Amino acid sequence: MGRVKPKYIKSLARRLLETYPDKFTDSFEENKKAVAQLADIPSKTVRNKVAGYITRLVKRLKTQEKTESAA
């Protein structure tokens, strides 16, 4: 089982994804660079957690779209 992400990471990730949906992909490395450019996060650990959560959200959205289009 994974660890639960704090609420501030989830809310920041969702806000960035809603504001800049075209900037993020399902690649963690690309999302890490995008988060560094778009948000002023001084901590590398927090930046990586936000980028990881965004990656997870993007992958989840892609699978939902795939299952909806197949049905």
From Swiss-Prot:
The keyword Transcription does not apply. Gene3D superfamilies: Ribosomal protein S17e-like (1.10.60.20). The keyword Cell cycle does not apply. GO terms for biological process: translation. GO terms for cellular component: cytosol; ribonucleoprotein complex; ribosome. One of its GO terms (molecular function) is structural constituent of ribosome. SUPFAM superfamilies: Rps17e-like. InterPro entries: Ribosomal_eS17 (IPR001210), Ribosomal_eS17_CS (IPR018273), Ribosomal_eS17_sf (IPR036401). HAMAP family: Ribosomal_eS17. This is Small ribosomal subunit protein eS17. It comes from Pyrobaculum islandicum (strain DSM 4184 / JCM 9189 / GEO3). The gene is rps17e.
